[in-house]
């Protein structure tokens, strides 16, 4: 190894020291290196800016999609009911818009809130199955085709179909779903009172689910307690709903059909004094109009034009007899 080291040393002595480059060349090299370095820095900054702009653009795009999606991709309102009667004034307030007055035969759509004042009542028809009536001072929102949100006043619902249309009424105290029935939902401060005239309802609140049947009045307290009472189908408290019933067109209907309508609206049952009286009611076609009359007043007016009359019987019955009976 020592010999090798000597040879290397001799070789270096022969070559001599490396010549230093001229000063001008050193300055040119340094300037070129500095320029290249600055170019690299600028390229990196440009890439970072592109990345930042890309991220910002993505964020703006996401916000835009969310905004316009919420505005333009939300479900469109759907017409779900038609106004069949207004006694006084009925206001409708579409979501995000000012209120306007409604008229009979106009429609109500999902997302709209309808309201009666302290002197007005109204009736709506949901499809072919459900009659909805609003008492005085009622505010209700049509949340969807099968859900109403009641914040003030009272609703009366009459569903006559064998397979009733689904409909849920929600209040602060709980919700009510019917199973083919006639019933009323009324708000009292934070309470909810459900009166069942016919059929059955299901009531749900924070405490659980319970049912109500015909003849029951169920009060749901803010604590979720259920307090039960009784109410007759012909009780005077139902009078407001009967007086707000959609107008019944008697033309070309038999007297028997009209009597059944009166019975349903007043919570009574029709009984005939004889088979002859029943046959006469089934065969008699009616003509005329009862517009503006409540069911009881209309009954008296119609019977006065026939050979039949109403006889005195129990409060829950409508007794019909021939004048000759």
Question: Which residue stretches match the model-derived regions?
Answer:
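A short, acidic loop/turn at secondary-structure junctions
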Residues: 2-32
């Amino acid at each position: 190894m020592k010999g090798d080291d000597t040879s290397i040393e001799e070789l270096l002595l022969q070559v001599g020291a490396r010549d230093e480059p001229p000063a001008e060349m050193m300055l040119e090299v340094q300037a070129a290196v500095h320029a290249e370095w600055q170019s690299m820095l600028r390229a990196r900054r440009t890439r970072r800016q592109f990345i930042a702009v890309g991220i910002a653009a993505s964020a703006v795009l996401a916000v835009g999609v969310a905004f316009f999606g919420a505005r333009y991709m939300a479900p469109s309102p759907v017409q779900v009911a038609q106004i069949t009667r207004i006694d006084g004034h009925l206001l409708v307030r579409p979501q995000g818009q000012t209120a306007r007055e409604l008229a009979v035969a106009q429609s109500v759509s999902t997302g709209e809130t309808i309201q009666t004042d302290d002197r007005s009542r109204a009736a709506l028809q949901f499809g072919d199955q459900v009659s909805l009536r609003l008492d005085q001072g009622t505010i209700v929102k049509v949340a969807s085709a099968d859900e109403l949100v009641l914040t003030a006043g009272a609703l009366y619902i009459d569903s006559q179909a064998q397979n009733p249309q689904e409909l849920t009424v929600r209040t602060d105290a709980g919700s009510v779903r019917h199973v083919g029935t006639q019933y009323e939902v009324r708000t009292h401060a934070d309470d909810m009172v459900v009166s069942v005239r016919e059929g059955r309802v299901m009531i749900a609140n924070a405490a659980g689910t319970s049912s109500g049947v015909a003849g029951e009045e169920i009060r749901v307290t803010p604590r979720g307690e259920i307090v039960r009472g009784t109410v007759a189908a012909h009780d005077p408290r139902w009078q407001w709903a009967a007086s707000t019933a959609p107008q019944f067109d008697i033309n070309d209907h038999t007297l028997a059909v009209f009597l059944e309508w009166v019975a349903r609206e007043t919570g009574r049952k029709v009984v005939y004094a004889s088979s002859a009286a029943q046959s006469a009611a089934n065969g008699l076609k009616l003509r005329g109009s009862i517009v503006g009359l409540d069911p009881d007043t209309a009954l008296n007016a119609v019977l006065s034009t026939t050979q039949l009359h109403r006889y005195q019987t129990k409060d829950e019955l409508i007794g019909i007899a021939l004048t000759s009976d």
